[in-house]
Regions:
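Short alpha-helical segments that sit at the start of domains
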Residues: 2-26
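Conserved segment of winged-helix/HTH DNA-binding domains
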Residues: 12-13, 17, 34, 75-95
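Short capping segments at the starts of secondary-structure elements
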Residues: 23, 35-39
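Pre-recognition alpha-helix immediately N-terminal to the DNA-recognition helix
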Residues: 26-30, 86
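Alpha-helical residues within the helix-turn-helix
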Residues: 45, 62-63
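Short, hydrophobic-biased segments on the C-terminal half of alpha helices
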Residues: 58-59
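Beta-hairpin "wing" of winged helix-turn-helix
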Residues: 63-73, 79
Length: 95
């Protein structure tokens, strides 16, 4: 592997780790694991946080490849990716 590929791999890992490096984001992943297809409003209400905060965390999770967004006629629904499931399993090993 050359240096450029190595740098790219490290940046990819950094983006992934930054995606779940917040307790609220981990909570959101747990919520979506138990109840997929939630809207931003649903998640905000479940966690007792404001809409804007929930939306920002979901955006960061999506950038990290941990959450997928699906648009329906009324709202955008979110679900975790298989990568997020691995992350949650990994985090459980650290408890």
């Amino acid at each position: 592997m050359n240096r450029e590929q190595e740098k790219k791999n490290y940046r990819t890992l950094e983006r992934l780790v930054r995606g779940f490096s917040n307790h609220r984001r981990i909570q959101i992943l747990e919520v979506l694991k138990k109840a997929p297809e939630q809207s931003v409003d649903d998640i905000a209400k479940l966690l007792g946080i404001n809409y804007k905060t929930a939306a920002d965390h979901l955006r960061r999770l999506a950038i990290a490849g941990l959450v997928l967004k699906k648009s329906d006629s009324v709202s955008i629904r979110h679900k975790i990716t298989s990568r997020a499931e691995y992350v949650l399993k990994f985090l459980r090993t650290l408890e």
